[in-house]
Amino acid sequence: RIEYADQISLRMLVQHRSGIPSFTDVPDFWLNPPNNSQETLSMVLDLPAQFKPGTEYYYSNTNYLLLRDLLDQILGYSHHEVVKKEILQPLSLDHTYMSLKEVNSTQIMSGFHVGYTPDLKTEGDTMFASAEDVGLFIRALNNGSVFKSEKEAAIYKEIYVYEHTGLMPGYQSI
């Protein structure tokens, strides 16, 4: 039910070259957010592709949703553990959290967006990081130290387009 699904590789998902529409671009997504990943994915099923896989670049949050769910299914445990073990711990990102349960919610900034009242901090799909940790991560990403091999680094170097600022109602990372 995803157009060209049989032609999309994991690399295309990582590089935002899959052509799969982003669920955040679906009308009313922000006004009526889904309750789980199945509901989220259903928002883009049967929609036309943005383009044929591998031919263009288009930032799609759906790609990350699919990658996350694949990791969980294949590994048999949460993608949170993978992120902690492979990224957060090696980079000593001690002020980055995978769950609201890990932090004092009164210590986290609340988002504000004119015309949109809900705060989008939710359990399970959100990460929280201090500005310092975000800076450390971006530095490691750009100098390649977050990657374990040249092959991993090449995936990032081949596609990175400075265009997405992490915008969602009430929050913007750059």
Describe every region a protein language model picked out.
Residues I2-I174:
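Short, surface-exposed loop or secondary-structure junction motifs
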